[in-house]
Amino acid sequence: MIAELVSSALGLALYLNTLSADFCYDDSRAIKTNQDLLPETPWTHIFYNDFWGTLLTHSGSHKSYRPLCTLSFRLNHAIGGLNPWSYHLVNVLLHAAVTGLFTSFSKILLGDGYWTFMAGLMFASHPIHTEAVAGIVGRADVGASLFFLLSLLCYIKHCSTRGYSARTWGWFLGSGLCAGCSMLWKEQGVTVLAVSAVYDVFVFHRLKIKQILPTIYKRKNLSLFLSISLLIFWGSSLLGARLYWMGNKPPSFSNSDNPAADSDSLLTRTLTFFYLPTKNLWLLLCPDTLSFDWSMDAVPLLKTVCDWRNLHTVAFYTGLLLLAYYGLKSPSVDRECNGKTVTNGKQNANGHSCLSDVEYQNSETKSSFASKVENGIKNDVSQRTQLPSTENIVVLSLSLLIIPFVPATNLFFYVGFVIAERVLYIPSMGFCLLITVGARALYVKVQKRFLKSLIFYATATLIVFYGLKTAIRNGDWQNEEMLYRSGIKVNPAKAWGNLGNVLKSQSKISEAESAYRNALYYRSNMADMLYNLGLLLQENSRFAEALHYYKLAIGSRPTLASAYLNTGIILMNQGRTEEARRTFLKCSEIPDENLKDPHAHKSSVTSCLYNLGKLYHEQGHYEEALSVYKEAIQKMPRQFAPQSLYNMMGEAYMRLSKLPEAEHWYMESLRSKTDHIPAHLTYGKLLALTGRKSEAEKLFLKAIELDPTKGNCYMHYGQFLLEEARLIEAAEMAKKAAELDSTEFDVVFNAAHMLRQASLNEAAEKYYDLAARLRPNYPAALMNLGAILHLNGRLQKAEANYLRALQLKPDDVITQSNLRKLWNIMEKQGLKTSKT
């Protein structure tokens, strides 16, 4: 137990510095915005949605079905909300548990000695695990590994207890259930069944390739045949159920996720896909350069046979074949009690022996021997060591390295990444075993004590360096800014783009703009980056530039609904209503098939319809507005906040004098968000109109209480007081509103109106003057300023404002009438007029 405890403790200690880390990268979508984690969402939705909260059968789903992992996130959310500390704690504890189980598994293969320690410590400290442990979404890989090892250990028990029917099939059942759980943590967990079959055939029974078929059909090997058959049946059942549950359709990804898959050249696809496992192995061997994302151009495509990286591919597969040949073709030899050797159960005086760990350490004590139990029948004639030979361990290590990695090779279907470090969490078990057994074989082979010491210290140094790299890399996962800055050298386009989002959230606008432009320098057709840059420019009132980048974003991805939405909003605010209307309509017609995030798309489409309804509403087309609002309600996703939409429905019904319907929607708005201020104000107006004055006043006062800094609340309350002939109170509310929102034309203009109606003409003049300065080319503002100046006896200033208003709107009858009256007064007073 010491090796397990020490290895687990190291795995725990190395990741303690992640407990203070924030949510990073994929954590946002899988946790922070995932509706399946919320208490109001039925927990059963977890079993119908993918890892990101999208319906599994939806055409845009990633098909990543990991309900047990999502369930663990939901439990975290129920206990600690969105505090990242508890999420990181669970990840670290899971890694420590997996490390302990892996060390226990290694002990079965390597014995209780230094080499088991080495395997466990190497796994605990390997830097390739940082994404899986420090990144919260990596819990899927760590959880799958936990049940992967439990399944494998149960199967090993099943093999060793053959002949005891109840116990052996109990262990087999446990192995199958754990394999199913591993798959429900992450898809590659199901591959443990294939690894178990490799263990049974090549390690427990020590068969070679040419012996499998002749041996497996022998009557005495019926239990082996039955076990392998059940493994195949259970694996096929799990895969069949998995395919059925996701709608029998493979996932679809954008070309930037996996550029090789999108290449038209068969040669490019072939060379690149053959090279990628080589690159993954290099990350295991030398995890010096790590990145949060390896998509896009992080690994350039191999387009010709002359690409020097093809040499790496050749070397990799040559080495792999040689290792496989060594493990599968070499005779497997065991030492008998009498000192002779046994090859696959037959005596062989010339074979080599399989030494135990104790013998490797030059001890005189031999490993314990057990009576051979093979194929369910005890064999007391020949005995063998408990430890498998080096060849057997090489075969099992290769199976652990290769088989769990196969789903990520694009062999059966294209995947949505080029390289994913967290996918290597399970294969790294095979890698650690392979390195350990190689070091052990070398240690046994050399004779000089100096060389043995050198091997010992070299492996210890490797573990130390791995641990240091892990601790340093964990620092990059502390927050998104550090993470994205660390990835610039590997994937500059993605890293700069994501860094821009972080800098923008920190209000570092110029730095964010620079980051977005850097991202577009490396990859100019990234729709998300074009959109994000457009949004940044829009928020800083650079509308012409924003429209340009929105247009480029739509050109790059015609289904990007959010770009249409913001384009329409800018056009509407610029008075280009027909262009805005067409833009909103086009957005509303975009289907959500094959989209990466259908929930976000539906939210944008709903917002487009909401703004289209507002456009119709402002134009006085209330029936058309209602029709659009109803369509928006039908299309809105469950995470969409509907209070503004419901409130506008009420407004439209009120304008159509359908007061009961209006009241219904105002109440719906307040039900969906009890502190929604616009609904308090509009519902208050309706109550005042229908004679429920005290209820109306309560709503106005509640709105002010909710946000005492919002001038519009005082404005509505002031209008109510004015209608109630409470003129002094109304005037106070008007002044308060104008002071709070002195840059908002509507508030200032309406405040001036109210003060004028309250006969406070001097105060009214002040705010009419401010309104005219806010909109110097708005005829109504100039006309009303002229009128109040007229009343206050400032006749020449009044004339100037009337004339300016008529320049902007020559046919305005009221202004013309007021000007004529003004001239009459001025002539009576002997003042010079522009007419004369």
Swiss-Prot record:
Protein name (record): Protein O-mannosyl-transferase TMTC2
Query: SUPFAM superfamilies annotated for this entry?
Result: TPR-like
Going by the entry's taxonomy, the superkingdom of the source organism is recorded as Eukaryota
Q: Please state the span of the N-terminal signal peptide per the UniProt entry.
A: none
Q: Where are the TPR repeats?
A: 493-526, 527-560, 561-594, 606-639, 643-676, 677-710, 711-744, 745-778, 779-812
Q: What is its EC number?
A: 2.4.1.109
UniProt family annotation: Belongs to the TMTC family.
